[in-house]
Amino acid sequence: MAAPLDQAIGLLVATFHKYSGKEGDKNSLSKGELKELIQKELTIGPKLKDAEIAGLMEDLDRNKDQEVNFQEYVTFLGALAMIYNEALLQYK
């Protein structure tokens, strides 16, 4: 049986691949795929406006190829983890 952290990492990877490749490159997320992932997988997702998601896409797309590759996705997850950690510290 996999350890909890192994399971969590596996879920993060599987979530990327669940949404990537529907509109093109199977190893990256288009703007539409990123939007769908955010809206379906994050609690805050449905509350975000299209302009906010577009801004997030622009921030994440470091190589400016109009897609979010796995490395850019992991950067996004790291930023989210930092936000979640700050929220947790406030409630301790």
Curated annotation (Swiss-Prot):
SUPFAM superfamilies: EF-hand (SSF47473). InterPro entries: EF-hand-dom_pair (IPR011992), EF_Hand_1_Ca_BS (IPR018247), EF_hand_dom (IPR002048), S-100A6 (IPR034118), S100/CaBP7/8-like_CS (IPR001751), S100_Ca-bd_sub (IPR013787). Ca(2+) 2 binds at D61, N63, D65, E67, E72. Residues 12-47, 48-83 form the EF-hand domain. Ca(2+) 1 binds at S28, E33. It comes from the Eukaryota. Keywords: Calcium, Cell cycle, Metal-binding, Mitogen, Repeat. GO terms for molecular function: calcium ion binding; calcium-dependent protein binding; enzyme binding; protein homodimerization activity; S100 protein binding; tropomyosin binding; zinc ion binding. The keyword Chloroplast does not apply. It holds the Pfam family S_100. GO terms for biological process: positive regulation of cell division. Disulfide bonds: none annotated. SMART domains: EFh, S_100. GO terms for cellular component: cytoplasmic side of plasma membrane; cytosol; nuclear envelope; nucleus; perinuclear region of cytoplasm; ruffle. Signal peptide: none annotated. May function as calcium sensor and modulator, contributing to cellular calcium signaling. May function by interacting with other proteins, such as TPR-containing proteins, and indirectly play a role in many physiological processes such as the reorganization of the actin cytoskeleton and in cell motility. Binds 2 calcium ions. Calcium binding is cooperative. PANTHER family: PROTEIN S100-A6, S100 CALCIUM-BINDING PROTEIN. This is Protein S100-A6. It comes from Gallus gallus (Chicken). The gene is S100A6.
